[in-house]
Amino acid sequence: MYTHDRSMVAILDWLAAIGAGSAGELAASCGLSPRATGARLRAMEDAGVTRSLRLLHGAPALHVLTRRGLRAAGRPELDPVAVSASGFAHLLAVARVAVALGNAGHRVGGERELRAWERAEGRPLASAEVGLARDGTVALHRPDLVCWGAGAPIAIEVELTVKAPARLRTIVRGWARSRLVGGVVYYATPPATRALRRALRSECAGDRVAVIPLDRAGFLPGFRSTSSIPSAA
């Protein structure tokens, strides 16, 4: 049903990598018309490989892969995305940022994909250390998205709301000290931007962490420190 239909394969691949997206993001990322995207999504949901959820008034439905869909995508190591009312807007924003980065020519992966790769490798690949977990192991913070390329990866965070100041400083400090990534980009709303800038000043992290308005998603700045990142990272 899927391997002979390149557009369905593209939808499977994108949802497996990013996690969730509306029909609009899938159409844009897979090069399909809205009508063609809708027809394929209906067929895929009927076949049990995707499910759709509409939990936010005025927002489009989000589509995610089921376990059957992950197997069809060749990604059985990934867990299905859990969609909640509280996290719906963030998942939608992450999908839109992923499309913008993809349209700008970047290879983009999601947080679940990164988690699976790090589990398989037995080490962090593009995560920040943020202290110790309850069991005494290093606690990791993973970004929402990762831009992969020939050099060090770029961690992408999508910040819609304001985190508690202490928690935000801890995350920013972890990113500032990380030598696994070439830099970190926060695409943020105005309130989140103000909080992030305070955290950046507090942690002297401006050379490693950039804050960009959410409506400019897709733009990636240069980072002066990328040349010091080991190529094996």
Language-model segment annotations:
Residues 1-82:
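Nuclease-adjacent, charged terminal/linker segments that flank catalytic cores
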Residues 3, 10-14, 23, 162-173, ...:
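Non-catalytic C-terminal interaction segments of nucleic acid-processing enzymes
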Residues 37, 94, 141, 168-171:
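Amphipathic coiled-coil/heptad-repeat helices and related helical stalk/stem segments
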Residues 53, 85-87, 102, 106-154, ...:
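Active-site metal-binding core of divalent-cation-utilizing nuclease and nuclease-like domains
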Residues 78-93:
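A short, highly charged nucleic-acid-interacting micro-segment common to nuclease
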Residues 95-102:
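Metal-dependent nuclease catalytic cores in nucleic-acid-processing enzymes
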